[in-house]
């Protein structure tokens, strides 16, 4: 990690190392693990892939997952975690999880839309009235289990969720009103609903993988992106985009996805341990998330020179609310979950809400 030289040459070296490592690991995984797990010293290797850095709350949550499993099943299983898209982009890693080459992958709901239409609902702008409602829905395990089973036909199942925060716009130039988005090329997740949302704001949606965003902003291919505050620091987007606007268009989870054949092959005792490990990883991630967001805001503002802008959220909301009806008409699979969320929104009205404290 600590190579004795810096600058542009160093960046090129890092890129080359990452490319070579990714190619080697992906090739090894694809060649040696197609449809089955690797066994070393009598232990089954469990491979877990995610797109974030090693300081990200999701990685810390997964370390708790690893520790919990190995403490109880260490004679049978070894959990290996691959951060930073080492095994490929989320979409590629999902495909490898389908085949069993990877056992678990952390994926955004936008990546899951192609496999189960119900996940499109999380791309709907202003779906949750507050962060309290969002967390209440996600922590209703009994209800969410039905949603998680929707990808069984594709060969994988969600086992838990992680908080991926409140998504906001950030760019090279200030964003105070929806008009400031007009004509701007904004990176979005590779989801039709996210593309429609950004276009409805008046911007030009540019769907691309998360790993490409820094260079795309730096080189002027795009003007900005939309994500939570950790993107500014963990992924260094604050080096190239200095304005972050709190328009709060989405509150989204990431999902820990497991190969279904692997889950079905576990004994009841093992299955319960993996399930408990997944629940623990969420508990750890949620605590780390809140701490990390505060730290990220401090670093972005005071060390990277990012300006945080409070905006009239309602002005942004009015631009995209018609998408609710459009999406409900176009995709019947989201209707039940949408109605369930609206019921919880209604119950929360008049009570304490913290959605404005992103």
Model-derived regions, located:
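A gly/proline- and charged-residue-enriched helix-loop-helix capping module
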Residues: 132-148
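Short, low-complexity disordered leader/linker segments with a strong preference
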Residues: 1-45, 71, 350-358
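Short, solvent-exposed secondary-structure boundary motifs
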Residues: 29, 146-151
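N-terminal secretory/targeting leader peptides
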Residues: 36-132, 151-153, 157-358
């Amino acid at each position: 990690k600590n190579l004795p030289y810096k600058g542009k040459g160093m960046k090129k070296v890092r890129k080359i190392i990452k490319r070579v490592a990714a190619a080697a690991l992906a090739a090894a995984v694809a060649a040696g693990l197609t449809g089955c797990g690797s066994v070393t010293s009598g232990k089954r290797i469990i491979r877990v892939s995610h797109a974030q850095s090693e300081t990200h709350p999701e990685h810390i949550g997964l370390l708790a997952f690893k520790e919990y499993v190995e403490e109880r099943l260490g004679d049978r299983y070894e959990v290996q975690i691959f951060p930073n898209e080492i095994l490929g982009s989320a979409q590629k890693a999902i495909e490898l999880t389908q085949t069993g080459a990877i056992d678990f992958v952390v994926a955004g709901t936008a990546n899951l839309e192609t496999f189960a239409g119900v996940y499109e609902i999380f791309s709907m702008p202003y779906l949750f009235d507050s962060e309290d409602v969002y967390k209440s829905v996600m922590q209703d395990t009994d209800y969410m289990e039905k949603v998680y089973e929707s990808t069984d036909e594709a060969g994988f199942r969600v086992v838990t969720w992680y908080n991926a925060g409140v998504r906001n716009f950030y760019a090279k130039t200030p964003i105070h009103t929806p008009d400031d988005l007009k004509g701007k090329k904004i990176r979005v997740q590779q989801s039709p609903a996210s593309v429609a949302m950004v276009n409805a704001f008046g911007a030009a949606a540019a769907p691309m993988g998360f790993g490409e965003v820094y260079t795309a902003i730096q080189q002027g291919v795009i003007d900005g992106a939309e994500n939570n505050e950790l993107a500014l620091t963990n992924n260094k987007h604050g080096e190239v985009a200095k304005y972050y606007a709190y328009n709060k268009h989405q509150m989204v989870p990431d999902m820990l996805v497991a190969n279904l054949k692997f889950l079905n092959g576990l004994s009841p005792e093992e299955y319960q341990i993996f399930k408990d490990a997944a629940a623990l990883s969420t508990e750890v991630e949620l605590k780390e998330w809140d701490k990390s967001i505060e730290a990220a805001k401090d670093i972005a503002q005071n060390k990277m020179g990012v300006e945080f802008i409070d905006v009239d959220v309602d002005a942004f909301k009015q631009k995209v609310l018609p998408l609710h009806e459009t999406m409900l008409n176009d995709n019947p699979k989201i209707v039940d979950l949408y109605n369930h969320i609206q019921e919880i929104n209604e119950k929360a009205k008049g009570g304490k809400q913290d959605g404005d404290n992103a």
